């Protein structure tokens, strides 16, 4: 499972994209139960409403320092939140900053390899490479959105000039 945390304008971090049953980075107030209509949707809702401070937990630490963190044995790491639900048990995690032009845009977090084992140094390298690509994609998306907005404003101004000229 994985989650992308985006760094907001106020410097805080918010989960914006999840894959699988990604465990929240804080203790949950609401119990996750079998009755929950969609566990993945429920967790996605929790993660998107969970705002982390820069420096808070491992996600916040990575956002603050811009350095990746590798947790090969999460069950023995006191920094990792422990959830009572076995579906949210964390075995191993990789936290990688999304950096572009020396600016941290967010954090990519990957939990629990599908092998059931722990992540390796090679996995850490792969996640760091994915984070670099994701940061570039985010910046390209931002640039495209700015271009679209500029085109829209230019069109509105052109229309306003035509209306004024009538």
PLM feature spans:
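Amphipathic alpha-helical regulatory segments at dimerization interfaces
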Residues: 1, 7, 61, 65, ...
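GAF sensory/regulatory domain recognition
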Residues: 3-50, 76
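Signal-transducing coupling segments at domain and membrane junctions
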Residues: 14, 43-45, 50, 55-60, ...
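Short hydrophobic/aromatic beta-strand element in the GNAT-like acyltransferase core
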Residues: 59, 95, 107
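Signal-transmission/dimerization alpha-helices at domain junctions
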Residues: 61-68, 101, 126-147
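Regulatory loop-to-helix N-cap segments in sensory/regulatory domains
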Residues: 81-82, 100, 105, 111-130
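A short, aliphatic-rich beta-strand micro-motif
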Residues: 91-99
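Regulatory cytosolic signal-relay segments
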Residues: 135-166
């Amino acid at each position: 499972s994985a989650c992308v945390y985006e760094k907001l304008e106020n410097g805080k971090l918010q989960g914006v994209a999840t894959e699988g049953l990604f465990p929240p980075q804080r203790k949950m107030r609401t119990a996750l139960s079998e009755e929950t209509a969609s566990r993945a949707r429920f967790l996605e809702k929790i993660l998107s409403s969970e705002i982390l401070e820069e420096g808070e937990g491992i996600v916040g630490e990575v956002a603050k320092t811009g350095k990746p963190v590798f947790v090969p044995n999460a069950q023995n790491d006191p920094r990792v939140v422990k959830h009572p639900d076995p579906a949210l048990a964390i075995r191993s995690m990789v936290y990688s900053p999304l950096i572009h032009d020396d600016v941290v845009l967010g954090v990519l977090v990957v939990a629990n390899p599908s092998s059931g084992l722990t992540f390796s140094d090679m996995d850490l390298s792969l996640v760091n490479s994915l984070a670099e690509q994701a940061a570039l994609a985010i910046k390209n998306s931002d640039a495209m959105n700015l271009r679209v907005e500029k085109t829209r404003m230019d069109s509105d101004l052109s229309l306003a000039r035509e209306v004024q000229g009538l």
